[in-house]
Amino acid sequence: MSAKRTKDAGRDDKLIASFQVDHTRIGYGIFVSRRDRVGGAFVTTFDVRMKRPNAEPAIHPNAMHTIEHVVATYLRNSRFRDHVVYWGPMGCLTGFYFLTSTEREIGPREIEPLIRAAFRHLANYRGPVPGATPVNCGNYLLHDLPTAKFEAKAFLAKKWSFDYPPARRAKAGARTVFDA
């Protein structure tokens, strides 16, 4: 991706890679957002996209919070638990980031069975939301299990993609402009 820049209050910052993805063309699925080497490990940030950005309603914050709790608990108790770094919501409320640490590079198709299993677990979940107490959670009343289960079922029913659509580039004089 290009080193597109933004200017704000005298700063000249490079636009981060995830903002250079064409969000008007992202579908449902699991995408590699970035890969980093940390020590001897490959830390991969996966974009688990449940909604089409700017094309359908975002997930309600209460449901996002519940999805975060139930899926994070599932992942951290799965056979993959030693490789889970983080599971958390995107600010745009269209999906989640899943960070893994592995000895070799892994891709979306390798974690697809785990993500599908986590969402099936959520879709069928009964009982209290894990960690939804005043002691364990900073906003324990901000939960909605029925809507979280609905969103899990809807996501599982979608056809998933595994490659980001490339950002469209256009030349404007000496500049390259991205539509994302």
Regions of interest found by a model, annotated:
Residues 88-161:
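Active-site-adjacent, His/Asp/Glu-enriched structural segments that form or flank metal-binding
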